[in-house]
């Protein structure tokens, strides 16, 4: 055991360190409260762990950590690959204070192509015979095809739009497909071939589907060659209409390829990783190339960067062994051995990047090529390859197209980190936190638009809905709208929500399809599953993206800070956490919607009640009958629009009195 052990540790702990085997493994340090301080791996546990206790580290971060260690746990493993996997699983699970930690991100989105189940000959088209493309996140079903992963939801939806334009595949849900009697708007704008009403044969649709799969796999040139051959064959047979269809498809595909000229690299699947460190913060920008197409990028911001730096450096020194010192004697051989010089210490950027690679690729498929802005430890790549069972190459100084990709990733990492530093402690930080939590686009947070709806009434009287707008990191008061709700059963909040969403988005959806308007990035409804289900029905009817909808559900006991988000597209509920910046923004927007709704409702109710004095002027109408009438018809306007027969159906109102009320209000 080393002589210079720190005196602040118990003999039992020091004895445990001295007894460690010289084998690969993972170690954990704990403080007096049982909190995890650090998780590390080592190819030699005895050598690595002893290095922490061999000297006094002073007032450094390592010194502060070491003085807090009261307990240690170790796990011996068979290989470095196994140690890598265990270490990073523990880091994600235990959230140690002195490890560089990347947030355990939600599962990546995929593009889903549903399975085919042929229909009977001569029968009407059925949805299962015509695969649909869809945005998907969750557990994979083997019967369907999945393409990805994609860096963000918008990358999936952008790809879906390309497939609609070029191959005209359907995106509608099966229930909508099976109940269509005529083509929808997507057919009119040439983004669907209308298989729902038999405008395309199953054979032709299957061919379009196969070409779409090849496009996603990067076989674009092969598709163009085949389409050209078929077009010429149709022209030779004087089938000019079919030839024109293929020409248009080739033109659409060529336009897509021209617009994405940056994606013409020869690589099929590559991840580009760039890191930037500044001001005690770090950003790793991950750009993804799949099937030869650049799908966009995604920033990651680790925590504990400053704490972990010195500790990681000490680990690296321990791995290098004795180096750079004087000659050592070897008594067994009777000769002097000069140690190899130690390799240069790793930069902070390299430490952050290696932490990202080790943690990120535990649950995410690893492409065969990683293009990195910093040199990556060969042992890490070897362990990752052993873990995945496939060959992985890490390239530090790329050329040609890869160089362009890496330069772009480095610029984006710098921009994202600069933006993060500028936004900290501000409303922008809340916006970013919400966008990250809900997988919204981070490219232009200034343009992120959220619309929130709330319903307000008093026992069914004077029902009013509000819509408030958040954009540019602030509430946009000039865009607030109130909707008087009519023609529903008083107190039916679900019907009120249906009415306001229908009125709000019917024209807006049409304008958005024509490029004359922009839909919000997120639609919040104040309520849980019931309100979200109602919003889902409206959006399905209007052909809008269900991924836009989220409901704010009260937590247990309706306590503030326990709210959960409920989604219309089938995603699991999300609990953001009591102190979450994202929840603070959600609460701010929801409370503003509630305030705007309730003030409008009170003003409307006051007007109704002033008008309600007309009822009390009618002989036979007292407070009880007046309240019954207002509750039944929602206000004086509802009573005025009712017939005498309808008024007579209210308890306590006779036919003669109903006719008197009708005459008084007309």
UniProtKB/Swiss-Prot annotation:
Keyword hit for DNA repair = yes
Subcellular location(s) per record: Cytoplasm
Function recorded in the entry: The UvrABC repair system catalyzes the recognition and processing of DNA lesions. UvrC both incises the 5' and 3' sides of the lesion. The N-terminal half is responsible for the 3' incision and the C-terminal half is responsible for the 5' incision.
Family (UniProt): Belongs to the UvrC family.
Subunit composition and interactions: Interacts with UvrB in an incision complex.
What is the first-listed, main subcellular location in coarse terms? cytoplasm
Q: Where is the GIY-YIG domain?
A: 22-100
| One GO BP annotation of this record | nucleotide-excision repair
Any one GO molecular-function label of the UniProt entry: DNA binding
GO CC terms, sorted: cytoplasm; excinuclease repair complex
The molecule here is called: UvrABC system protein C
UniProt entry tagged with the keyword DNA damage: yes
Task: Extract the InterPro entries matched here.
Answer: GIY-YIG_endonuc, GIY-YIG_endonuc_sf, GIY-YIG_UvrC_Cho, RuvA_2-like, UVR_dom, UVR_dom_sf, UvrABC_protein_C, UvrC
Boundaries of every UVR domain copy: 221-256
Classification via PANTHER family: UVRABC SYSTEM PROTEIN C, UVRC/OXIDOREDUCTASE
What are the entry keywords? Cytoplasm, DNA damage, DNA excision, DNA repair, Excision nuclease, SOS response
């Amino acid at each position: 055991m080393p002589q210079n052990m720190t005196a602040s540790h118990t003999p039992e702990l020091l004895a445990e360190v001295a007894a460690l085997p010289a084998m690969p493994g993972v170690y954990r340090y704990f403080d007096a409260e049982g909190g995890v301080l650090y998780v590390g791996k080592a190819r030699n546990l005895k050598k690595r762990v002893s290095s922490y206790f061999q000297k006094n580290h002073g007032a450094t971060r390592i010194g502060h950590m070491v003085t807090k260690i009261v307990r240690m746990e170790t796990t011996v493993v068979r290989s470095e690959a196994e140690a890598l996997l265990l270490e990073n699983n523990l880091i994600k699970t235990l959230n140690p204070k002195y490890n560089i930690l990347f947030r355990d991100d939600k599962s990546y989105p995929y593009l889903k192509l549903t399975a085919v189940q042929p229909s009977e000959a001569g029968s009407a088209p059925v949805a299962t015979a015509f695969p649909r493309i869809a945005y998907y996140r969750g557990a994979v079903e083997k019967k369907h095809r999945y393409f990805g992963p994609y860096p963000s939801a918008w990358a999936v939806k952008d790809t879906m739009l390309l497939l609609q334009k070029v191959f005209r595949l359907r995106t509608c849900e099966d229930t909508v497909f099976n109940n269509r009697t005529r083509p929808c708007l997507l057919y009119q704008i040439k983004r669907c071939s209308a298989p729902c009403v038999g405008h395309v044969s199953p054979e032709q649709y299957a061919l379009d589907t196969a070409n779409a799969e090849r496009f996603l796999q990067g076989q674009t040139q092969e598709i163009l060659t085949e389409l050209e051959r078929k077009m010429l064959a149709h022209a030779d047979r004087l089938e000019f209409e079919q030839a024109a269809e293929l020409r248009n498809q080739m033109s659409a595909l060529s336009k897509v390829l021209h617009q994405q000229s940056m994606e013409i690299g020869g690589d099929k699947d590559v991840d580009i990783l760039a890191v930037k460190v500044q001001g005690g913060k770090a950003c790793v920008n991950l750009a993804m190339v799949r099937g030869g197409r650049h799908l966009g990028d995604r920033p990651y911001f680790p925590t504990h960067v400053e704490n972990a730096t010195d500790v990681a450096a000490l680990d690296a020194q321990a791995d290098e062994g004795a180096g750079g010192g004087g000659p050592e004697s070897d008594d067994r051989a009777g000769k002097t051995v000069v140690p190899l010089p130690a390799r240069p210490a790793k930069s902070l950027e390299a430490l952050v990047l290696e932490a990202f690679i080790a943690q990120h690729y535990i649950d995410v498929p690893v492409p065969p090529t990683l293009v990195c802005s910093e040199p990556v430890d060969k042992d890490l790549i070897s362990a990752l390859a052993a873990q995945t069972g496939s060959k992985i190459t890490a390239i530090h100084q790329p050329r040609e197209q890869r160089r362009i990709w890496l330069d772009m990733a480095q610029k984006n990492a710098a921009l994202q980190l600069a933006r993060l530093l500028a936004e900290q402690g501000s409303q922008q930080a809340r916006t970013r936190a919400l966008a990250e939590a809900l997988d919204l686009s981070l490219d232009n947070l200034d343009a992120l638009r959220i619309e929130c709806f709330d319903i307000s009434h008093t026992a069914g009287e004077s029902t009013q809905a509000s819509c408030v707008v958040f954009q540019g990191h602030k509430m946009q008061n000039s865009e607030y709208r109130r909707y008087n709700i009519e023609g529903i059963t008083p107190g039916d909040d679900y019907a009120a929500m249906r009415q306001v969403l229908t009125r709000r988005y019917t024209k807006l959806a049409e304008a958005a399809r024509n490029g004359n308007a922009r839909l919000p990035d997120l639609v919040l409804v104040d309520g849980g599953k019931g309100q979200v289900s109602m919003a889902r029905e409206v959006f399905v009817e209007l052909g809008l993206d269900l991924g836009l909808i989220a409901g704010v559900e009260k937590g247990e006991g309706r306590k503030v800070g326990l709210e959960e988000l409920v989604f219309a597209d089938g995603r699991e509920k999300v609990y953001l956490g009591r102190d979450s910046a994202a929840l603070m923004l959600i609460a701010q927007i929801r409370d503003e919607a509630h305030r705007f709704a309730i003030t409008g409702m009170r003003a409307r109710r006051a007007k109704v009640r002033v008008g309600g004095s007309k009822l009390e002027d009618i002989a036979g109408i007292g407070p009880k009958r007046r309240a019954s009438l207002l509750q039944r018809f929602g206000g004086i306007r509802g009573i005025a629009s009712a017939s005498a027969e309808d008024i007579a159906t209210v308890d306590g109102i006779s036919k003669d009195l109903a006719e008197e009320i009708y005459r008084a209000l007309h």
